[in-house]
């Protein structure tokens, strides 16, 4: 349109121009800028012109657009010029497209009465990330030549993002991080974006003809939005020239030593632009490539890829040189050579190695445990040195260290090594397991295992330690090796008894060989150091001065203690035995324990009548004829050597004839008159059986016949004692209580005391005279004892059964089991009627050594009588007269060696030490020489003297008891007219050692079970080599083969009884 047409006619132009200038001068024009985000909701207020222009709004003010504008985008309110988003909303991509800025500009006119104003409004629509990038195609194919050098760029289609600025496309990348390509996004000068696929490494179509990759496009919004597309890269062949290595003549590559087999070292892509066979390239190693390298590396002849074929080791070789030759297959093949240098990079692939060398104890022999442990440790150390570290070495090493080793003592040498280099080969070592050991650095890579404290095998016998070696690589490798230290035992602990004092109780009259107790000691050491043996500590027992080893014996292996003799409570109340426990170490250690053997009292003593003194088992009490009822007639006093209930006495009067006229206090012993004797004539005799019993179980009793003679006088009915009973009883004996004391006046007490003193003096004079007379007879008769007994009726004839009559063979032979009744004992012969009834009055026979006493007409061995067998009046068994604490017996003849000696009944104990209760045949405790040579000489002398009774049967059946029994043949010129009678002895007949199959089993309950017990057993059973035989009857001449066989009684303890009694019916030959 021409200017004339645009402005009207030429004449009107100046007027219009003037009007416009006037309007512009009158109107106040201004530009207002607003901004809003796309996608804001319709009706969103963008701004108010009246407020922003500071205009006074009146009723006639209005705002209008200068020209028509799309009201669906923006709206202007007339009243105040408020701008709001239209109903269609604002879409920046639709309004402005890819423009960096999107501004909506328009003019608004404000009318009012005062003025006219033109306002230029600019509304900037800001972008919102409401669109994600998108690729033009989901599959994007790309072709690249295999000869393309590294860095080759291949254009790619750029993804589209309708947003702009930061919300637009920001990056394009490959999802595979290790692909040979990279995508680069660039912006050109005109602002357009382009994407290139960059080749990162050379391609080899023969090894990989295509790559399937994934492209990822992403914008910069918050949060960002992305899109993906598949990228297919096809490698094109190019082979129209001679092969050419892109690396040149020399190529270097670095390879980690832990690279897996098959890893690609280098792709020797020798380019040949020819096609077909001319471009078909074959790759081979050159002639100068070493054989070792050919085994470790592989070259693909078609692709030229150099890969790893074997495991490399930096510690063995760190560099390899390979000659690679490329040759095409065309006529007149062309070749190219490339030297490939492969450098091995060290990695931490070797764990540290630990070598342990234990040290033997100084001076230990080759066969000692220390040397053996050292040899085993050296072998284990060699194995460890030859192995490759595997992280944990299972083979353990054992060291042996004595428990007496001082602190800081060397135990073992530890050496560490690592075949890696640098920090990978630097090793640090630590010792774990116990604070008693520690590591002490020695020199580079070596440490010393030393003791950090004193060792005690009894507390900890073995230490399980752990050696840990770790290098300084990344990540570090470590080796863990178990290490055992055994503590060698030393004899540093003495045996310890379970308790220091053992209290043992044993009843007296125990059988020799009886088990007493067992002491136990423990030694925490091992081996010989912990082997405990027991022995007795020698000491003297009591006043006798005998060694304690003659009383008891201890088993050295088990500590069992056995009695070697029978204990007597009345002579030994307690036996203190010290037992020493010693180990087998060197030096030997020992400790002692005290064994207190308390002997318990047993009812083995019968009551003894003290006052009035009995005569031949009878008492005679004078009773005044005018005595009235309840008059004290006499007081009986008795004693019992036992204690406690065993010594409590009770009195009884039984079998009173012709009537019961007397009673006795059961505990006082006082005899009272219970009837009236005024009508009895003088000389009338009342008889009663006095029974004195103790409180033992079973009780022992003593009986005596009491004759009460009625006298005409009226004197005291209580007879005077010939001696004070208090002075006559032995120490330790008990007197029966005397009951209520009688009322004596002073003159009577003086008379009784003077009479008692005179009686004691007279008794002492008689005893001395009798002893002197007996010794003169023994010297004059050569030790042969004869007892002369005047006949009760006629005078000079010997009583039946007397020793003289027995010696001449005219009297009855004495029974071996008869009981000799000594003066005052009141005992009846064994098997005689008097054993069951009160003894009748018999004629007294004078016996040397006794005064006014009488004996029975028979003499026999002092074994148990029939009353003992019945158990009602049991008495202890005695091996000789007086053994059971009885009154002194008449002298007897003793055969010792080849002669006879005359001794008293009480003295027989000294000559028969093996039956006197002294104990075992210990050193210096034998009646004769019991050494081996002495026994041989004694046996040979017996054989030469014809003292053996062996027969032809002995060679077939073995020796019998008669072969071992002592001979009774003595020097007597009067041979007996008949075969010799069996001898009677006061001692138990025992046999010398003989065939074990014929051994007499006296104490089968104490059979030995160990070597120590066997020695005890033999001590008890075979200590009779020099046994002395005490004979009652004198010896008679005659050869031993002509004598009858000797009857040897066997003894066994009946059930429920601890008393030994002879068995009936075994008086035949054994």
From Swiss-Prot:
SMART domains named in the record: CA
Q: Name one GO cellular component term.
A: presynaptic membrane
Keyword check for Nucleus: no
Q: How does it sit in the membrane?
A: Single-pass type I membrane protein
- The UniProt entry lists the main location of this chain as membrane
> Any idea which GO molecular function terms this record carries?
calcium ion binding
| Compositional bias ranges of the Basic and acidic residues kind | 780-790, 906-921
**Phosphoserine, modified sites:** 1053
Q: Which GO terms describe its biological process?
A: chemical synaptic transmission; homophilic cell adhesion via plasma membrane adhesion molecules; modulation of chemical synaptic transmission; morphogenesis of embryonic epithelium; regulation of synaptic membrane adhesion; somitogenesis
Q: Which InterPro entries match?
A: Cadherin-like_dom, Cadherin-like_sf, Cadherin_CS, Cadherin_N, Protocadherin/Cadherin-CA
Glycosylation, residue list? 616
Chain residue ranges for the region called Disordered: 716-740, 777-859, 906-928, 1046-1070
What residue ranges lie in the Cytoplasmic compartment? 769-1070
Transmembrane segment boundaries: 748-768
The organism's place on the tree of life at top rank: Eukaryota
**Which Pfam families would you find in this protein's record?**
Cadherin, Cadherin_2
The signal peptide stretch is 1-29
Ranges facing Extracellular side: 30-747
Q: What does this protein do?
A: Calcium-dependent cell-adhesion protein. May play a role in activity-induced synaptic reorganization underlying long term memory. Could be involved in CDH2 internalization through TAOK2/p38 MAPK pathway. In hippocampal neurons, may play a role in the down-regulation of dendritic spines, maybe through its action on CDH2 endocytosis.
Subunit annotation: The N-terminal extracellular domain forms homophilic interactions; these interactions activate p38 MAPK via TAOK2 and trigger endocytosis. Interacts with CDH2; this interaction may lead to CDH2 cointernalization. Interacts with CDH11. Interacts with TAOK2.
List the protein's name: Protocadherin-8
Q: What is the gene name? A: Pcdh8
